[in-house]
Swiss-Prot record:
It comes from Arabidopsis thaliana. It catalyses: L-seryl-[protein] + ATP = O-phospho-L-seryl-[protein] + ADP + H(+); L-threonyl-[protein] + ATP = O-phospho-L-threonyl-[protein] + ADP + H(+). Belongs to the protein kinase superfamily. Ser/Thr protein kinase family. The lineage of its organism: Eukaryota, Viridiplantae, Streptophyta, Embryophyta, Tracheophyta. Gene3D superfamilies: Bulb-type lectin domain, Phosphorylase Kinase, domain 1, Transferase(Phosphotransferase) domain 1. This is G-type lectin S-receptor-like serine/threonine-protein kinase At1g61460. GO terms for cellular component: plasma membrane. The chain crosses the membrane at residues 393-413. It is a single-pass type I membrane protein. PROSITE patterns: BULB_LECTIN, PAN, PROTEIN_KINASE_ATP, PROTEIN_KINASE_DOM, PROTEIN_KINASE_ST.
Amino acid sequence: MRITFFASLLLFTNTIFISFSFAIAGINKESPLSIGQTLSSSNGVYELGFFSFNNSENHYLGIWFKGIIPRVVVWVANRENPVTDSTANLAISSNASLLLYNGKHGVAWSSGETLASNGSRAELSDTGNLIVIDNFSGRTLWQSFDHLGDTMLPFSALMYNLATGEKQVLTSWKSYTNPAVGDFVLQITTQVPTQALTMRGSKPYWRSGPWAKTRNFKLPRIVITSKGSLEISRHSGTDWVLNFVAPAHSCDYYGVCGPFGICVKSVCKCFKGFIPKYIEEWKRGNWTDGCVRRTKLHCQENSTKKDANFFHPVANIKPPDFYEFASAVDAEGCYKICLHNCSCLAFSYIHGIGCLIWNQDFMDTVQFSAGGEILSIRLARSELGGNKRKKTITASIVSLSLFLILGSTAFGFWRYRVKHNASQDAPKYDLEPQDVSGSYLFEMNTIQTATNNFSLSNKLGQGGFGSVYKGKLQDGKEIAVKRLSSSSGQGKEEFMNEIVLISKLQHKNLVRILGCCIEGEERLLIYEFMLNKSLDTFLFDSRKRLEIDWPKRFDIIQGIARGIHYLHRDSCLKVIHRDLKVSNILLDEKMNPKISDFGLARMYQGTEYQDNTRRVVGTLGYMSPEDILEIISGEKISRFSYGKEEKTLIAYAWESWCETGGVDLLDKDVADSCRPLEVERCIQIGLLCVQHQPADRPNTLELMSMLTTTSDLPSPKQPTFVVHWRDDESSSKDLITVNEMTKSVILGR
């Protein structure tokens, strides 16, 4: 799912609601509600009354937000049967039923039979719930929250009772001016874990993907529109702000790529190991028939043979439909459950949910550019591309032999040039085990056992200098193993940096290295395993971002600052990280931030203030000031869309700071938990960190003081980023980022 922020008048901008009214205290047998009267909640947020569209004679009984123009209706009683008589009124019967009389035309709507009561009244609660209450016991006999329309308010809920089959769903209006039941229904599924599903008639229209039980969406208003869009919005000032809309993209429509198809940026593709079912139709853009497996699986339960199937991980996935929940305590257990079940086609271990497996065709799968989950799909081992026919192997022997002879000569010359250059340009230390003070040297066979011989099912991510694997030692301790790619021309220097630096650095906000392995050409780093992956997987994921509210984000900002302050001032070595960004901030099981990936770090003496190096590296500044703004806004630094304009996040932050003090920069998903003074302070600090003159930027000691006290801060000047962004885009790129040098993309530490 994708979150889209923009100001909106929402739904009823062009529709005029007509009503002239005065308030009454409540509804009882002696005091009905007539046209021209309203019933308000005690907190003044909601109002019940009669309304019509564009001077029409058709009147509806509804609930709306009081005092907000244009009026936004959240519940309608008589959706299918408007009243036309000017004497229409809402009364309460002796058996506690609400009755809407259409003058001499009789009853237009009824709440239905309720429990026996000797006296009752109707009230509008502070949550927007119309309730019928027993006068003697005080119990609720009927409530509108049990009969939802097209809108869900914060304290109402979608529901599916497995025992009775009873459902509470949202049903769309026929049009913006006709509240009768429309074509779309929003419901939750009976699956475990559940997911939201929009139906158009009997066919799925949009699906959210599985929800974690811990996720709590405290949002003011959720609507299923007459066009089938799910919209989540909040009122801010005089406007409605649309926090989320779905479907918003062609990939959001259910099953657009068919079985075993995967939608990537509006284009359908087949999973690895699959091909289009009908190639000619696929080429014409008719993708609904999907894909089929290229190589049939030959599964043997409990098989450990090399010719058995293997699991191929696919990252950034919206999990497909038709999953089943399996009781597994961790990703390894999930892998084993699927491995030993021949009908299991894929598995995914999702934080906050657990283990999901698929025994049916993959349907409605989407791959995002960031975020999402890792889906490991079962493929025949031949899909690895490692098994060649004997004829091909035989025909290649002569050519290969000749290649090796010529290659050996070229390799020898290349090694001489590398060593010659390295002696002048590389760091003044050799890659030897004894250099790793304080770290434990692991045996290669120990790491191979822990990572299942570096199996693909254990692979967490792929970076510029190699791959990262999850492992489990014999004592049960989980580890992350960074395996240097032998084809990397720069990787050894970065590898040596990480060993020498991290082995001597100890701080709760730095990732801890457990040891290394140096055997032959193999170079491995062994880290502590981070259960919650990296910070970017939360910030830029429309579902996970809701799990980190403002207090947690502020704690993360302070934790990063503490780690950087330690590197700059308090550690035995003075270290500049040089590649700090949210993807290099890992989160432990308690969501504590830990700085990782020291491949580009540089040591300097206590008297040195310049980092002299020819290598172009990552982000500018001490704490990567953009990180503060990304954590606050939940948006990536490179481009930030606001309305019809596209600008850098820093440019938008500066404009927001000048106009409103920066509060509208805050990620709207955490607005309910924010502390405005802290937010404004963090934005001001972020702008100070990107000042053009170094003297205007705070050092790490000043940064820590700014984040932990309430002392007055200097006023920031307009950043150079803002001045030059439009005038010279190539120049601004040099200023803003050189993140092409990112050294690892780790999805699951």
